[in-house]
Amino acid sequence: MCLVNEFVSNSNMKPALNVSGDEKELILQLRRYLEEKLTYLLDQNGTVSIGVSGGSMPRVFSKAILSLPQEQLNWKRIRIFMVDERNVDLDSEESNQGEYLRLFPNELRDVFVPMQIFKDPCLTAQHYEISLRKYLLPEQLNNTARFDILFLGVGPDGHTASIFPGKERLEKITELNWVSVITDSPKPPPSRITLTLQTLQHAKNVAFIICGKQKAEIVRGICDRDQKYPAAQARPFNDKLTLFLDEDAATGVPDRDSSDSDSPPPFDG
């Protein structure tokens, strides 16, 4: 299996950069991005599909989207999906979707498309893919879904979603499916469900939220398209990539002074 998807762009387009000094500024930048994208997408599409990750993202994403003028959002046309999840019960402290549900008001929890958890992670993945195919219009090419926006994080090893570095791990991920099972995650718990790299690459917009000096090297790898990092491979093939960074992570941006730092993301939905 080829580790680099055939749809990775060969263009030299740089990611759009948004660098923040603290979490408050980060949330404001995320809010601006969400407001622009959702305004456009809700005007153009029947529904809007958003994929979200775990870690610290539930807190900052929830604060950003819930701070938008609620009267301007048609929540019935917004669907939020998990990019990846640990195969644990919803009430577990390790559950990412459980954390999102705890942060969202009861009346808005229906925007989340649930990932039903089974003891067997393969069953969890199968049922989740069925749900995705029900809610998302598949891309004609390769029958692959196109999320409107994916919000991704990265680990200090360069993993994103639950796609960890290493040839053997990457080769276990079935690119023909939208969802894959991870049973040997280097981070506990070992069993996880994740969107595949091909699914990430087909998204219309991908936004990374990255903070910390220890991730500056990964930021450089993403900007330089260093394929040893899954996070770099997750760049969408249309190159609509936005990085939300703190000052420490931004030290990894090559030639930052001559880049499009703090510029608004490429915008046509």
Curated annotation (Swiss-Prot):
Cell compartment(s), UniProt: Nucleus
GO cellular component, one term: cytosol
Location, primary (coarse class): nucleus
EC number(s) reported in the record: 3.1.1.31
Annotated metabolic or biological route of this protein: Carbohydrate degradation; pentose phosphate pathway; D-ribulose 5-phosphate from D-glucose 6-phosphate (oxidative stage): step 2/3
Enzymatic class: hydrolase
Family: Belongs to the glucosamine/galactosamine-6-phosphate isomerase family. 6-phosphogluconolactonase subfamily.
Entry-linked NCBIfam families: pgl
Protein name: Putative 6-phosphogluconolactonase
Species: Caenorhabditis elegans
UniProt lineage: Eukaryota, Metazoa, Ecdysozoa, Nematoda, Chromadorea
